């Protein structure tokens, strides 16, 4: 069995075989010590005694089995070293056809690449190289002369411990060639972003989604390495009479892992749907805040909600786990802000797809807020990247069209005025534009959810006022001179207003103009 595991993938586990649950007779005395995890709930025996949890009556707890399966799926070696790294950022500067404007300058592409490296604890940029490349998809990425120059520079810098090739994906043969030529680990943008995600992910769901996103990377590694291992023999081409070569065995293990991850994520998706249903039942409007990574989404939500527990960080992908935060609009209507994962240019589609369960919350929002960091030189490219990604998520057209555009960090751009009508200039640090944003949010939320602001005349001695406090948002109660009635201003849904008129037909006149 140990040989079997070694044949699959270093650091990669074969699918577990579900353990048989043994029910021990009370008369049997175990000769080995046992450890009680929770009194009266689970006892773990020795390995020779059958292992695994022993439950009273032989009944399995499905939740424990689910957790065990999830824990197993989350066990995987890191994609990149966890220790200190001094990285050479190598950027292929692709020449554009004459007359075609580049999407971004090499300078800012390198700056973003360096920021990704520095987002990891203990990692630093030892050097940066911008090298012309006519065909970055070729085997060696660069032409013969440029490749020779790059090799000399990398080998001449003793401080470098690894090389970040700033391309979306590197073909396995290219990775092998470059690592052989330079004697260092070489990784691409996809691998680095996945590693950053791994380091920042906190919830089981985010970690599961990352494990699924890693499958193509592991599969390409299997396809590259296993052929060599087959040719080198491994003692025998076939393992334990299974009729499968190491390549086939490892590929099958990956297929099984992918299926199990998708099953677990679907289970987690179902739980998320239940949470959404509860929010709908309680009629909390939901506002999703989206934008490029490190554009200031979390800081903005903190300014809107006053939630001290939020801890914004000035680094890419500081937010990976979708979080929900309650806030009040000027009308005193309570809404929920959803802080989402930031987007990035040249982010592989399957990585976004892996986070579809998390980003599904965006599709069910009432209002979308698109935040753009206008202090960044590539603000327009970042904005286009976010819009392109949102369109790829197949969001409802009405939600996309009604999105509020927020230009953030305007305190870093003196005298800034939005170039397009409808955009809101906001600084979460100085407070500029926050009141205008709250007013715009309120108008959008009321419109999207069918709520309205009404002033109703109700009797103070009856149950009407108490009902309104429970079913609507009471903004103001103005007692009338007669003393037994009041004008009550409320934010109320059309459905709730219909129920109010049905319950109190005599005392519910038409709403007064507001």
From Swiss-Prot:
One Gene Ontology term of the molecular function aspect: metal ion binding
Highest taxon of the lineage: Eukaryota
Residue ranges of the region described as Disordered: 48-71
Stored Pfam families: GTP-bdg_M (PF16360), GTP-bdg_N (PF13167), MMR_HSR1 (PF01926)
Annotated keywords: GTP-binding, Magnesium, Metal-binding, Nucleotide-binding
PROSITE patterns given in the database record: G_HFLX
Location of the Hflx-type G domain: 285-449
Transmembrane segments: none
Cofactor: Mg(2+)
Biased amino acid composition, Acidic residues: 59-71
Positions contributing to Mg(2+) binding: 298, 319
PANTHER family in the cross-refs: GTP-BINDING PROTEIN 6-RELATED (PTHR10229:SF0), GTP-BINDING PROTEIN HFLX (PTHR10229)
Homology family: Belongs to the TRAFAC class OBG-HflX-like GTPase superfamily. HflX GTPase family.
Name of this chain's protein: Putative GTP-binding protein 6
Species name: Mus musculus
């Amino acid at each position: 069995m140990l040989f079997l595991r070694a044949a699959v993938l270093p650091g990669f586990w074969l699918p577990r075989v579900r353990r048989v649950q043994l029910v021990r007779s009370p008369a049997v005395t175990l000769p080995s010590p046992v450890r009680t995890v929770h009194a009266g709930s689970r006892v773990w025996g020795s390995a020779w005694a059958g292992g695994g949890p022993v439950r009273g009556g032989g009944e399995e707890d499905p939740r424990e089995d689910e957790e065990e399966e999830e824990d197993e799926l989350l066990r995987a070696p890191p994609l990149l070293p966890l220790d200190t790294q001094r990285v050479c950022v190598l950027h292929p500067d692709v020449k554009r056809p004459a007359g075609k404007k580049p999407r971004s300058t090499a300078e800012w592409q390198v700056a973003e690449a360096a920021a990704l490296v520095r987002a990891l604890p203990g990692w630093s940029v030892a050097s940066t190289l911008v090298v012309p490349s006519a065909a970055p998809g070729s085997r060696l990425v660069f032409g013969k002369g440029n490749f020779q120059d790059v090799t000399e520079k990398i080998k001449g810098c003793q401080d470098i411990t690894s090389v970040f090739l700033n391309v979306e994906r590197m073909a396995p043969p290219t990775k092998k060639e470059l690592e052989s030529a330079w004697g260092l680990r070489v990784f691409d943008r996809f691998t680095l972003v996945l590693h950053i995600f791994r380091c920042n992910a906190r919830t089981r769901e985010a970690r599961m989604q990352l494990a699924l996103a890693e499958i193509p990377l592991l599969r390409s590694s299997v396809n590259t390495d296993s052929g060599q291992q087959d040719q080198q023999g491994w003692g025998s081409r076939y393992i334990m009479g299974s009729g499968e070569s190491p390549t086939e065995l490892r590929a099958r293990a990956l297929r099984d892992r992918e299926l199990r991850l998708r099953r677990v994520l679907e289970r987690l998706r179902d739980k998320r749907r239940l949470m959404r249903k509860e929010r709908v039942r309680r009629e909390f409007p939901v506002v999703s805040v989206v934008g490029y990574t490190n554009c200031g989404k979390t800081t903005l939500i903190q300014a809107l909600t006053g939630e001290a527990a939020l801890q914004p960080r000035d680094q890419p992908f500081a937010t990976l786990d979708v979080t929900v935060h309650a806030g009040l609009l000027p009308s005193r209507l309570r809404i929920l802000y959803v802080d989402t994962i930031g987007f990035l240019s040249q982010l592989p589609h399957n990585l976004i797809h892996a986070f579809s369960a998390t980003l599904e919350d965006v599709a069910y929002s009432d209002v979308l807020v698109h935040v753009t960091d206008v202090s960044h030189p590539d603000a327009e490219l970042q904005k286009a990247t976010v819009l392109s990604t949102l369109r790829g998520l197949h969001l409802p057209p009405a939600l996309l069209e009604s999105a509020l555009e927020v230009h953030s960090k305007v305190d870093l751009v003196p005298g800034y005025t939005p170039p397009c009508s409808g955009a809101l200039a906001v600084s979460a640090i100085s407070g500029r534009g926050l009141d205008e944003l709250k007013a715009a949010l309120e108008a959008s939320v009321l419109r999207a959810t069918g709520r309205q602001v009404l002033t109703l005349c109700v009797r103070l001695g009856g149950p009407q006022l108490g009902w309104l406090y429970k079913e609507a948002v009471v903004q103001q109660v103005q007692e009338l001179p007669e003393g037994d009635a009041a004008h009550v201003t409320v934010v109320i849904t059309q459905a709730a207003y219909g129920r109010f008129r049905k319950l109190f037909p005599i005392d519910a006149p038409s709403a007064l103009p507001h």
